[in-house]
């Protein structure tokens, strides 16, 4: 399992990055979600790694 936490604002991000954050289900700063560790989720995290914090649980 991966815990993904939004730590930076989406202000100034391009639309694809905003869509990725939305697809991850993150809306507010400091909001956390848990995901299965799959290549799809890893790819999404890689696209917005400057905005999120990831921990394995």
Swiss-Prot record:
InterPro entries: Ribo_uL30_ferredoxin-like_sf, Ribosomal_uL30_bac-type, Ribosomal_uL30_ferredoxin-like. Keywords: Ribonucleoprotein, Ribosomal protein. It comes from the Bacteria. GO terms for cellular component: cytosolic large ribosomal subunit. CDD domains: Ribosomal_L30. One of its GO terms (molecular function) is structural constituent of ribosome. GO terms for biological process: translation. Part of the 50S ribosomal subunit. Belongs to the universal ribosomal protein uL30 family. This is Large ribosomal subunit protein uL30. It comes from Maridesulfovibrio salexigens (strain ATCC 14822 / DSM 2638 / NCIMB 8403 / VKM B-1763) (Desulfovibrio salexigens). The lineage of its organism: Bacteria, Pseudomonadati, Thermodesulfobacteriota, Desulfovibrionia, Desulfovibrionales. The gene is rpmD.
